Amino acid sequence: MSRAVGIDLGTTNSVVSVLEGGEPTVIANAEGGRTTPSVVAFSKSGEVLVGEIAKRQAVNNIDRTIASVKRHMGTDWTIDIDDKKYTAQEISARTLMKLKNDAESYLGEKVTDAVITVPAYFNDAERQATKEAGEIAGLNVLRIVNEPTAAALAYGLDKGKEDELILVFDLGGGTFDVSLLEVGKDDDGFSTIQVRATSGDNRLGGDDWDQRVVDYLLNQLKVKGIDLSKDKIALQRLREAAEQAKKELSSATSTNISLQYLSVTPDGPVHLDEQLTRAKFQELTSDLLERTKKPFNDVIAEAGIKVSDIDHIVLVGGSTRMPAVTELVKQLAGGKDPNKGVNPDEVVAVGAALQAGVLKGERKDVLLIDVTPLSLGIETKGGVMTKLIERNTAIPTKRSETFTTADDNQPSVAIQVFQGEREFTRDNKPLGTFELTGIAPAQRGVPQVEVTFDIDANGIVHVSAKDKGTGKEQSMTITGGSSLSKEDIERMVADAEAHAAEDKTRREQADVRNSAEQLAYSVDKILSENDDKLPEEVKTEVKADVESLKAALAGTDEYAVKAASEKLQASQTKLGEAIYASTQAEGAAPAGDAAGAPAGEAKPEEDIVDAEIVDEEPKNEKK
């Protein structure tokens, strides 16, 4: 049987791990390091360099060296090398191929399967791109797993039998996530790890701390009248020096940045010799640190717990070695010290290897349950966002709802898929649209269209729609450019919180209009079907009320719609009384069913419009 590995495909560094005898082992690369820089370079001779060797030659080959490509995953980013365009997937695949080769050299056998980790807040396009990179590298990607979840898996398996809450604070080179997970273990030693909530920022990481130091050094040179902001080689040397200074300041209170012959100007060579203290470094990056607070607090609020309920805090990612980060986490956790027993660079890959072992049947003592970070739904009448899957729902998951048509003899329905937390689709992010055609001619409210959302274990979304009458079906997989960026997700959640009251009012108004429109339609239908049974004065009065309601619906005054609707509801009772009296007089069967009206009130024949769901599940089962 081929071997499966776990891979942490990081922004700045990557790690590969494998199970040996059921226990995870981190594999050293060909250069002897346990972490491999996520750097790819194309030498002038056409050779592809990956890892430490690529990073070392970057200064002399800056235009042909690519770092931090993870930040471009899921976008249309490309780079031209020797008249050939490379996508982010192709560059990432080079790193994965090196990890695969290093693992094969260590194991002495072929590696074909892998579990690859991604930030918890990676969207659908970014997950798809990561999976594609694995496939380009010749790997069968068993599963895409969220990095904090993998870390908790690695950390939580040796915990006690009581249910425990683990908070994972993951600050990597380019991304940031916070996740809360619950770890339980039964008497037989079987562990269940379930994600309770997750939040993050896909554009925040150690690279941003490095850039602040680079900007500071450039400004120091500018004061002396030297501008190196366009000098690519100087910028690369500054980036490398900034990264090294950041690492040194994790253990020292100051460091010296000395770069001789950084550049050459008409006035001669430029040398840089700058002392950087930890205090100055923390001052330069204080706003970056501040950005980590909201996701932390959001996760606590989303899970509905108190900070004191957290049993363990796990720091993941090399950037968590910065003293200011450790101190902030302790402060946010109410004085609780983060766990120091895990290697923040390796714990994610270890968890990925464990999950690979589970999927290959090498470990049978653990179940991993992950979540989707954002709600998914479709647009229904009135522009309402009807959610089928709520955010932080465990995945894989599948949910179906039955909808209907808004007009008589409607031949097709457009299924518009959205992602977000707002009540109206115009405030959310469109993911895609497809059309279900060939619906049999029928009155509005009669056709039943079942819409199904299916999120697989990788967090990738599939949507289908089926006409229950004809059996016709259409489907699509959400891919590529239609997925959300992290900024979009953050904005949506923030907007949803800020506009919750406004959304509630607008939703109520939409519901009133939808109900009023259905009422006018139903009463109109009763009038036409029972024309010969109704006294003229009743018909005249009710018709006038119907027209008043239609006129109100044509306007924008919500109070007028509500008032006209209430008036028609009152007058429609006369229809029921008149029809009932007429049928009794004729000695006919009760007309309630035919007219759609029980005695005393003409209820709409079926309260189904495009904005409403034919609820096939008990209310308490909806998430």
From Swiss-Prot:
The modification Phosphothreonine is found at T175. Acts as a chaperone. Signal peptide: none annotated. The gene is dnaK. It holds the Pfam family HSP70. PANTHER family: HEAT SHOCK PROTEIN 70KDA. Belongs to the heat shock protein 70 family. InterPro entries: ATPase_NBD, Chaperone_DnaK, Heat_shock_70_CS, HSP70_C_sf, HSP70_peptide-bd_sf, Hsp_70_fam. This is Chaperone protein DnaK. Residues 584-623 are annotated as: Disordered. Residues 585-601 have a biased composition (Low complexity). Induction: By stress conditions e.g. heat shock. NCBIfam families: PRK00290.1, prok_dnaK. SUPFAM superfamilies: Actin-like ATPase domain, Heat shock protein 70kD (HSP70), peptide-binding domain. Keywords: ATP-binding, Chaperone, Nucleotide-binding, Phosphoprotein, Stress response.
